[in-house]
UniProtKB/Swiss-Prot annotation:
Gene source species: Bacillus cereus (strain B4264)
Record protein name field: Putative 3-methyladenine DNA glycosylase
Family annotation (Gene3D superfamilies): Methylpurine-DNA glycosylase (MPG) (3.10.300.10)
SUPFAM superfamilies found in the cross-reference section: FMT C-terminal domain-like (SSF50486)
Keyword field: DNA damage, DNA repair, Hydrolase
PANTHER family linked to this entry: DNA-3-METHYLADENINE GLYCOSYLASE
């Protein structure tokens, strides 16, 4: 079942941890592409210097962060890599969770084509399919078109994984500093990156 609106409400750090083990789904040309979320980062504007919304900064790009929880915030880095975030916290509190890595599940052939333009790939390439925010967006076909989209729809959503199938029993959740935020002064050290320790698709050990 799809995660209901209430799933995205509450403390952003708790929502981040709840997202681990759930499935990110995107339907592209009628074909389901998905992956189990294995790594996330929480961003808690306006006080978090690593957040795009630090200081209440409100731009065309960040406007969706000030909206209702349970919407997609997609942006570009280096002018070419998309990053997918889930908006959390009440309206007016610009916070969200970056999805950093997935374990691919559905639409593997389409994911391989999206990443490598071929379906015959090496084991190393397979592990590289979705082990980073830009990689997973390319794999699942997530672009700026999805910015601001409600996750209460059939095309793009979070699918809750039944307890008996959830991988949380196999991996320990570990917290640590977020990645590539050297500009963020004291926020560099906040342990707001959560991931399954030892999972092969985690972007950075």
């Amino acid at each position: 079942m799809q995660a209901p609106p209430s799933f995205y409400e509450g403390d952003t750090l708790e929502v981040a941890k709840k997202l681990l083990g759930q499935k990110l789904v995107h339907i592209v040309d009628g074909i389901k592409r998905s992956g189990i979320i294995v790594e996330v980062e929480a961003y808690k504007g306006p006080d978090d210097k690593a957040a795009h919304s630090y200081g209440g900064r409100r731009t065309d790009r960040t406007e969706v962060m000030f909206g209702a929880p349970g919407h997609a915030y997609v942006y570009l880095i280096y002018g070419m890599y998309h990053c997918f975030n889930v908006i959390t916290a009440p309206v007016g509190t610009p916070q969200g969770v970056l999805i950093r890595a997935l374990e691919p599940v559905d639409g593997i052939a389409e994911i391989k084509l999206a990443r490598y333009n071929k379906t015959e790939i090496t084991k190393a390439q397979y592990k590289n399919l979705t082990n980073g925010p830009g990689k997973l967006c390319r794999a699942l076909g997530i672009t700026l078109k999805e910015r601001g989209v409600s996750l209460q729809n059939d095309t793009l959503h979070i699918e809750l994984v039944p307890k008996e199938e959830h991988i949380s029993s196999q991996y320990k959740i570990t917290a640590g500093p977020r990645i590539n935020i050297d500009y963020a002064e004291e926020a560099v050290h906040y342990p707001w990156r959560f991931y399954y320790e030892g999972h092969p698709f985690v972007s950075k050990k």
